[in-house]
UniProtKB/Swiss-Prot annotation:
Keywords: Activator, ATP-binding, DNA-binding, Kinase, Nucleotide-binding, Phosphoprotein, Phosphotransferase system, Repeat, Transcription, Transcription regulation, Transferase. It comes from the Bacteria. This is Transcriptional regulatory protein DagR. One of its GO terms (cellular component) is membrane. The gene is dgaR. Residues 462-567, 835-932 form the PRD domain. Gene3D superfamilies: P-loop containing nucleotide triphosphate hydrolases (3.40.50.300), Phosphotransferase system, mannose-type IIA component (3.40.50.510), PRD domain (1.10.1790.10). The modification Phosphohistidine is found at residues 497, 870. InterPro entries: AAA+_ATPase, P-loop_NTPase, PRD, PRD_sf, PTS_EIIA_man-typ, PTS_EIIA_man-typ_sf, Sigma_54_int.
């Protein structure tokens, strides 16, 4: 074969490995790159390529260096014949077809994600504007997703479509007058002079100002139901009346755009919802694709670049941190965070006089564990560089780069990436050694992304029976080498890879590239097994297995062994980390798991607003679900250190508790579990020998007991009464392991002084008192909370934090009535002087139980308390005065006659026992009390 034919074949092979996105990125091939692949001199290859161009078999670009593409392969890719004028082009991208976009005057195109995650939202917004006379719109989504910005885009789009006057956009935040319906009416609809006190002149409302345009009602959920109903006439008929006007209503042409962060069903009237024709839900930032998140970050950095008139430079770790940072405020919070990062960098570099603002990982608050997709796209974006420089021209080029990384849809990501990346690097004149180093760094990320992408989990299409049988035999060979069967989530991507490999080899798309340095260090022990499997591929699939397949097989075999290790690593022994903070435990566990290359640690985060009981409930559910028979529990501070004995008693298992955990001790435990022992007594001794604090909790250990401290600033007398109420209500639960201690308020403010009141083996369960003493992580119940609806439940959470939700509900039913009785007794003792308080209270409880059962009532604790106190005092009043309350009753058309009759019947035993008669007025008051 002549040299020119070899060059033509290589050019065709390389061109067929391209896609349209590559052409958009100006990807083509130089004489040097082709010469490197074939081992030929650059000048000889250049001569042959120019001859091929003269013969019409290749096209080339003008400029230096000169790029070439195979003409027929390019026409196949484009799906059209090239014109004669296109034999030589200014740039490779010139041969691409013109893409269809929205008209350039469409404001929605400035919205990142308008053609992807926000496509449905944009189409709904455009439809609402374009429909004759427009449609009303409800925008929903969490805070900070850009609802106001979306409404402004709708208005700008309406302005572009308007043939006459520009429609106005009037903004109103419904929270401003949420609690004053009259001022709300005046502000929205206007008022006439004299409509109310202080209305000295006519006022135009926002509705009239928005006539012919849009009224944006932000935070519409803050409107009361009455406020929502005031808008019905506009929504239904396009009419309204200013405040104080009773004449003919005024016609109006206004479209409402309502925005809310709350669930629509709970915040808005159903009758209000159905009057709004279009509902648009905007997703949170972490529901957007990774490429959109990167575009948002770069867009905000580009905005700061224009503001400060400098290039902004960011490194890879900081960009990954921004992608993984928890953002409760979504896009709005991201914008503020980026502004703050730029301000920090500006302040730290004020003494330096350069044109670049440097942002780097030192500004990040914590380490992150990025996903393979994030690493892939960020690697694609940085193109092997250490930093990304952002200025006014960055975003358009970035979108093309991200599209290349995100749209890889070929049947096998590994080889499609390898081919494309290799070609790009060689065309960039990167030396061979550096090319291998760059590829090696990226292969692990691309492998993980391809293996665990959602597309890989789905069932791939089936091929001919003969090929399927051979691929199945190959999978069996892999399982034989590994020594265990593969789960379906690994079989599917393996099968898909083998089927794709056949096509790539037959089309000659795999570059003749191989070096042992491409195999990651952690995978080199799988080299012999991978080589054996390559021979099996040659034998079963009848193809020449490329040397690069050894690299993929090494990665796959190592991942399978890690998977097996995660499954087999003491499945009966859980290792759980709990730490204060929204993501502290998760971040630390992910970091250590990545270092150890196994999923060893599970994490439970404890945000600031989460209670100790809720955290314990999460822990117990995790243990129940995973059926652990042993547990290693790692915690940081506070009440979490008591979870060890609680879990040990609750599940009757051994628990190794490690308090005051740090990242260093986490790594130490992980290494010991991986390479030393998972036996808890042996592990305890090993850790203690390294001076790492730990404690082995067993079910047989005696519980040291709990102490509940009661303290009132009003004096010891009040504290004694509270103690008495709690003993009568929850005495059975306290048994021998809980005691109550009364302390002066000044003593409670110091944790050291509180500890002095405890025995060495006791722990502080919580504090009940007047004011919050401010002790860190010590549960506190105020008197207001104690006597509220949630009072008994709060006390139960202190005394029995290890109860399940079902057990807690059962105990609540038992204790709630005793709690109410105890409170009622304390109250009626102060008001009853003639009757026996215990007797009358017991009788009234019987009446109350009869009423709730007969009338199917579920009254609140407040209603129960009021009923018992009122009825006990009522009976004593009638006994002393010898006559009931006498008052004229108005006609009550809504009175439930049956319920009224049941109430009368229930009090007959009381009337007989105390020789009294209750009037209808007394019964009516009791009726109102129960049904209020």
């Amino acid at each position: 074969m002549r040299r020119i034919e070899i060059v033509l074949g290589e050019l065709e092979r390389l061109t067929r490995g391209l896609c349209l996105a590559d052409l958009a990125q100006e990807t083509a091939f130089t004489a040097e790159a082709i010469g490197f692949n074939l081992g030929l001199a650059r000048n000889s290859v250049s001569k042959d390529l120019n001859q091929l161009w003269n013969d019409g078999l290749a096209i080339k670009s003008r400029g230096r260096p000169v790029y070439f593409l195979h003409r027929q392969a390019l026409e196949t890719l484009l799906g059209r014949q090239l014109e004669e004028s296109e034999r030589e082009v200014r740039s490779v991208a010139d041969v691409l077809p013109h893409e269809e976009h929205y008209a350039p005057d469409d404001p929605f195109t400035s919205l990142i994600g308008y053609d992807r995650s926000l496509r449905d939202a944009v189409e709904k917004g455009r439809a609402a504007v374009l429909y004759p006379h427009g449609l009303h719109v409800l925008l929903t989504g969490p805070s900070g997703v850009g609802k106001t910005f979306f409404a402004e885009l709708m208005h700008r789009f309406a302005c572009e479509q308007a043939s006459g006057a520009i429609p106005p956009l009037v903004y109103f935040n419904c929270a401003e007058y949420a609690h004053n319906p009259e001022l709300l009416s005046s502000h929205l609809f206007g008022h006439r002079q004299g409509a109310f006190t202080g209305a000295n002149e006519h006022k135009t409302g926002l509705v009239e100002q928005a006539d012919g345009g849009y009224l944006l009602l932000d935070e519409v959920h803050r409107l009361s139901y009455e406020g929502q109903e005031k808008l019905f006439s506009i929504l239904d008929k396009g009419e309204y009346r200013p405040l104080g006007v009773s004449s003919q209503p005024r016609s109006i042409s206004v479209r409402l755009i309502c925005a809310t962060t709350e669930p629509v069903g709970s915040a808005l009237l159903r009758t209000f919802q159905r009057r709004i024709q279009v509902c648009i839900d905007l997703p949170g930032i972490h529901q957007r694709s990774v490429e959109e998140q990167i575009e948002l970050i770069v867009g905000f950095l580009q905005r700061e670049s224009r503001k400060i008139e400098r290039t902004v430079s960011i490194d890879k770790p900081l960009l990954l941190w921004l992608l993984n940072k928890p953002l409760e405020g979504n896009i709005g919070q991201l914008k503020s965070d980026i502004q703050f990062l730029c301000a920090q960098a500006w302040a730290s570099g004020m003494t330096e006089h350069n044109d670049t603002l440097q942002l780097d990982k030192r500004l990040a608050e914590m380490s992150v564990n990025p996903t393979p997709e994030q690493r892939l796209l960020v690697d694609t974006l940085f193109e092997g560089k250490a930093r990304l420089n952002i200025d006014a021209r960055t975003l358009p080029a970035l979108k093309t780069s991200l599209a290349t990384g995100a749209e890889i849809e070929e049947s096998d990501l590994f080889y499609s990436f390898l081919t494309r990346e290799y070609v790009n690097l060689r065309n960039s004149n990167v030396p061979p050694a550096e090319t291998l180093a760059i590829l090696k760094n990226k292969l692990s990320s691309i492998f993980e992304y391809g293996l665990y992408s959602r597309d890989s989990v789905a069932h791939p299409p089936r091929y001919g029976d003969q090929i399927e049988e051979r691929v199945t035999l190959l999978i069996g060979c892999v399982e034989q080498v590994l020594g265990f069967s593969l789960p379906e989530n690994l079989v599917n991507p393996l099968r898909k890879h083998f089927l794709a490999l056949i096509g790539y080899v037959q089309r000659g798309l795999i570059p003749q590239l191989y070096s042992s340095s491409l195999i990651l260090d952690r995978c080199k022990d799988e080299y012999d097994n991978a080589t054996l499997l390559c021979r099996k591929i040659n034998e079963l699939l009848h193809i020449q297995c490329p040397a690069t397949e050894v690299v993929w097989l090494c990665l796959f075999l190592k991942e399978c062994r890690h998977y097996r290790q995660r499954i087999d690593a003491s499945p009966d022994c859980g290792v759980i980390l709990i730490a204060h903070g929204a993501t502290t435990a998760t971040s630390q566990a992910q970091y250590v798991n990545r270092v150890l290359e196994r999923e060893l640690f599970s994490a439970i985060d404890m945000p600031f607003e989460q209670s100790v009981h809720d955290t314990l409930e999460t822990l117990t559910q995790m243990i129940q679900t995973r059926q652990y028979r042993r547990l290693i529990l790692l915690v940081d501070i506070g009440s979490l250190i008591h979870f060890g004995s609680t879990i040990s008693k609750l599940f009757q298992i051994d628990v190794l508790l490690m308090p005051n955990i740090t990242l260093t001790s986490l790594l130490e435990v992980g290494l010991d579990l991986s390479y030393e022992t998972s036996d808890l007594p042996q592990l305890t001794a090993l850790l203690q020998s390294k001076n790492i604090p730990c404690q082995l909790c067993t079910p047989q250990q005696e519980n040291g007991g709990k102490v509940l401290v009661i303290s009132c600033i009003t004096g010891m007398g009040t504290a004694e009464k509270i103690k008495k109420v709690l003993e009568e209500s929850f005495g059975e639960l306290m048994s021998q392991d809980t005691r109550m201690v009364i302390l002066d308020y000044n003593e409670v403010r110091s944790l050291e002084r509180v500890q002095q009141a405890l025995n060495a083996s006791e722990r502080l369960a919580g504090i009940v008192g007047t004011f919050q003493p401010g002790l860190p992580d010590i549960p506190f119940i105020s008197l207001e909370e104690l006597f509220s609806e949630q009072g008994p439940e709060l006390v139960l959470s202190l005394l029995t934090p290890d109860l399940s939700n079902a057990e807690r509900r059962l105990e609540m039913e038992r204790s709630a009535m005793r709690f109410i009785s105890a409170l009622t007794m304390e109250s009626i003792i102060n008001h009853i002087s003639v009757l026996n308080p215990q007797r009358i209270l017991k009788e009234m409880e019987g009446v109350f139980n009869h009423l709730t059962s007969s009338l199917s009532l579920k009254p609140s604790r407040q209603v129960t308390l009021r009923f018992l106190i009122h009825c006990c005092c009522m009976v004593e009043r009638i006994v002393i005065n010898r006559k009931p309350l006498q008052m004229a009753l108005e006609s009550q058309p809504n009175l439930d006659a049956r319920a009224f009759s049941v109430i009368k019947s229930a009090f007959l035993p009381i009337e007989d026992a105390y020789a009294i008669r209750l009037s209808d007025a007394e019964y009516f008051y009791i009726y109102e009390l129960l049904y209020s």
